[in-house]
Amino acid sequence: MTELLQSLSTQNEFVARHNGPNKSDQQKMLEAINAVSLDSLIDETVPAQIRLEQPMNLAEAKSEADMLAAMRKFADQNQIKRTFIGQGYYNTFTPNVILRNVMENPGWYTAYTPYQPEISQGRLESLLNYQQMVMDLTGMEIANASLLDEATAAAEAMTLCKRAGKSKSNVFFVADDVHPQTIEVVKTRAKFIGFEVLVGALDSLPEQDVFGALVQYPGTTGEVRDLTDLIAKAQANKTLVTVATDLLASALLKPAGEMGADVAIGSAQRFGVPMGYGGPHAAFMATRDKHKRTMPGRVIGVSIDTNGNQALRMAMQTREQHIRREKATSNICTAQALLANMASFYAVFHGAEGLRTIARRTHHMTAILAAGLTKGGFELAHNSFFDTITINTGAQTEDLYAKALAADINLRKLGTQLGVSFDETTTVADVEALFAVFGVKEEVAALSTEIAGNEFAAIPEALRRTTEYLTHPVFNTHHSETQMMRYLKQLENKDFSLTHGMIPLGSCTMKLNAAAEMIPVTWPEFGSIHPFAPADQAAGYAALAKDLKEKLCEITGYDAFSLQPNSGASGEYAGLIAIQRYHESRGEGHRNVCLIPSSAHGTNPATASMVSMKVVVVKCDEEGNIDVTDLAAKIKKHKDNLSSIMITYPSTHGVYEEQVKEVCEMVHAAGGQVYLDGANMNAQVGLTTPGFIGSDVSHLNLHKTFCIPHGGGGPGMGPIGVKSHLAPFLPGHIENGADGENFAVSAADMGSASILPISWAYIAMMGEAGLTDATKVAILNANYVMEQLRPHYPVLYRGSNGRVAHECIIDIRPLKEETGISEEDIAKRLMDYGFHAPTMSFPVAGTLMVEPTESEDLEELDRFCDAMIAIREEMTKVKNGEWPLDNNPLVNAPHTQFDLAKEEWDRPYSRELGCFPSKATKSWKYWPTVNRVDNVYGDRNLICSCPSIDNYED
């Protein structure tokens, strides 16, 4: 290629669009922080002993058009068939009003978890609707705001049963009619907690001495049976019973709660979320009110703001890993908020009557198929069903299965039986095609007429739902597309996302989620593939996964990857399991001590506890580094039982620890393994790797470094990379040929496969040079912010040359002593200036951790720094007595439009200062919709269901 052609190429355009500061602005920033060049800044920041000697061996950057063309080749290798496999995954129609206005809308998918409720009221309302939907359909008293998938929800339910129950047994019963993938994930969780799993016939449950039980309703083979007596008998034996159920079936069937279930779990996938080869989808958990504080996951509750107006928030956060650490109810952080919102809106759009019609149509099609097959001489395994039937096909099984495949139809093979599951997309033509496969001559119309006289004959009368559901006005208002569009926009407008401004959350990497990366996610070639379809139908997914894993190995210095974990916490869990299985394979299963620095994220100790490790905390020194002397003492004390150490790099204190290789060597010398948390991988890519540093295993947060959007609290992905000696211990899956114990951690082999194209696209469009440049710019942005703020705020940790990594910690503690203003006051005041707050009080209480990422431009960085400096000046006015401590712009923040419109203004500062505190806010203003939320009131007066419509009107 000539020099001119090269200069005109679009090949590297994306890098400049992804990174915020252009070359000219980068030079200004370097001058401002007294750095000669970007490379010299990196030399001053990143220890020489961990720097890579060679660049990564990755392909050159692709243009957006070339990337999409390459992605199309992957997609075209997938084959969309008529799929009737079921097993927890179903085709569904995503209402286009939801597809366009939520799934494809950065206002919804770029928001963060709603820890700052004043700027999150929209998605909090939607998630509250989700909880109400789940409670109504399951007949339970309280629900959470989503879990990762149905199988992990079942594993979480098992631990809830143990915590909440009174049985002294250590055995958990699983009915053999539970989905196979769920059974395997439950077995994994049980093994490492120390529970025994007993898989048996459902009717044997009352005889068992078990602390908990898991049953499926309808069963995996489709049978619908009354569980009421079985549940009562089990509960009489101190057994808590979890029912894995189906939300659409619950529109017609007696719900699990009315049969006495203690816990109900399942997946909301079929409520408008594509199968996507396994995910992401929102799982749900609902339980009795008395178990609410042992229920894992986020729970949305109703509270009030400082003016007494209704406000929503995340409730009961003291249960969660970021507070309780190794004593938490679960290690779950990121759940599936975006998918829960889609399912919630599906229920809002259709309403109770719409859902009932969809359920009736699905059931009627199934009843027609069952009647035709029966008349055609086939025997059904059971005659009570909702949407799934199992046919005893005997010696004909293989031939019929092959005949179906030849007709582009996927059935479920169950030994000498074939399973068929219908859904809302099933048509008369589908039924006729199945009749042709089975050689049935019956007419669909005639069968429909025959069934119409007793439409629900296949549902025993005692199991037909009689109670109402989705009666709240929100489910009975927005049924035209105009109404729905406006409701979605109304909620979106309440929330702060990357469409509004920088979200400088430390340790969260809220970088650009580029439109080109997102486009393939909605292609049907990725969305319409069943996770258990024959492998040749998912060849595109296999090729994409293989290439992505190779790229991730190159980026991390690892030898093998698993894409199965569907969150960062799940990746941690899979990584520690790999370590423990490795020790067991060497006859050292007694190694159970996990060393964790005091600065670690709360998931680390919570995850270690989930694999029955003993957590031993290692001190950090005054510079934020691991205290090597204390580490040596802890290693010496626990040498014989040392399993591993969990570290984060750069550390959660925002510095590159110079002795990190020494730390790894010390642990290895004592027979331990090194787990390097990949949360801060955005500061490593192209400069160093976990493998080069000396780590044995890491998870990567693809929703941080590799551009999968946070979705307002999920989805995420946490694939794990390992050195070769740990590769045999990566999670397997029954649907991928794993025999015996497979140690699955997710319901599907490839986890949340349909969002993998996002990360592949990012890597492809950045190329080696672009990825490395992004890391350097992230470090530049963080150091620029740090130097701008340092004259006004104490910076807690810096490296030996005075630099920080990709984030910095601002210490508010001495300023609070001096002025009385807290880190929370600053966080809330930033909303008035048009910003989401930095991370509060992590990893050090009383601090703010700022991570600007590489995607923020100089103008936005300056706007943030100007806001922080102005807030510091406001603090000084409080200190000097110009404003009282209990009545000033900081403690009254955030300010709303209602404040601006008040007839009386009893504050010692102007309306303008309160509501438009900067020049930038006068040209464009984001408005919080509620004042500061009262967290204490919300937990003392716990309401986790939709409040009366009167509350919204007030």
Curated annotation (Swiss-Prot):
What keywords appear on the UniProt entry?
Answer: Oxidoreductase, Pyridoxal phosphate
Q: Which InterPro entries match?
A: GcvP, GDC-P_C, GDC-P_N, GDC_P, PyrdxlP-dep_Trfase, PyrdxlP-dep_Trfase_major, PyrdxlP-dep_Trfase_small
Which domain of life, per UniProt? Answer: Bacteria
The molecular function terms of the Gene Ontology recorded here are:
glycine binding; glycine dehydrogenase (decarboxylating) activity; pyridoxal phosphate binding
The record's region (Disordered) falls at 1-24
Q: Briefly, what is this protein's role? A: The glycine cleavage system catalyzes the degradation of glycine. The P protein binds the alpha-amino group of glycine through its pyridoxal phosphate cofactor; CO(2) is released and the remaining methylamine moiety is then transferred to the lipoamide cofactor of the H protein.
This protein is called Glycine dehydrogenase (decarboxylating)
Please give the organism: Vibrio campbellii (strain ATCC BAA-1116)
The record's gene field reads gcvP
